[in-house]
């Protein structure tokens, strides 16, 4: 059975894919994120004892436009992919379906802590102090699982990691841009992702593989450690992506000299612009930091 066939078989057995009356079933508590393709809000789910959930509603026209890029390739939907991701460091997807307006809807675990994006942009050191190594390991393990399942996430960035309360743990979210790691989906031309964290091969419309995620992961970890971008410095906008293969990144130890050098070295190897010089798989990154116990050395 092919990867896509196995995904669809598991999805059918989950009972997902039906109609979801968003306005009747959920009581919105607050809007969490308004993205380029979808809106995400926290709500009480009346069908499940008013438990708090995250609800993602994808804009229909943007969804159709994105999916049209893969016409004829039998691409699994975001819902089909997300339902198959069962890992302690990935936010669980409870159900997927379509709203009464035909919009794709995903109902997922509510993770109560701050987003890594807010922590990094607002330089909230108290959330990360003494916890970076642990959180980075959990992030790496979640990405390793995605890769072992046969996918490329394609949007690894701080916005797509949410901390648990008190930043004791972290979870990966959002499979809206995720694609199978198979030849038809790795051909040049699909330039999607978050520009500040986008690998040169995506920017330049070259062939891709799972190493695009490793680059984005490396940039994300770098920003976690020093609250600066390896190329741009201050995290302001996506234009820095144009420099990802035209100038070298600033060495992490220059900006964070007390960071454990083994962790710093692993992060710098992950974000190398040249694919052949980059960490080849996330398991190698985990191996490189296996003995790192503390964020900083005396």
Language model segments and positions:
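Conserved short submotifs of the Hanks-type protein kinase catalytic core
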Residues: 101-115
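AlphaC helix of the protein kinase catalytic domain
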Residues: 116-127
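Protein kinase catalytic-loop region centered on the HRD/HxD motif
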Residues: 141-151
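Activation segment signature within eukaryotic-like protein kinase domains
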Residues: 135-136
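Conserved activation segment of eukaryotic-like protein kinases, specifically the C-terminal portion
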Residues: 188-201
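Short beta-strand micro-motifs within the conserved protein kinase catalytic domain, predominantly
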Residues: 92-104
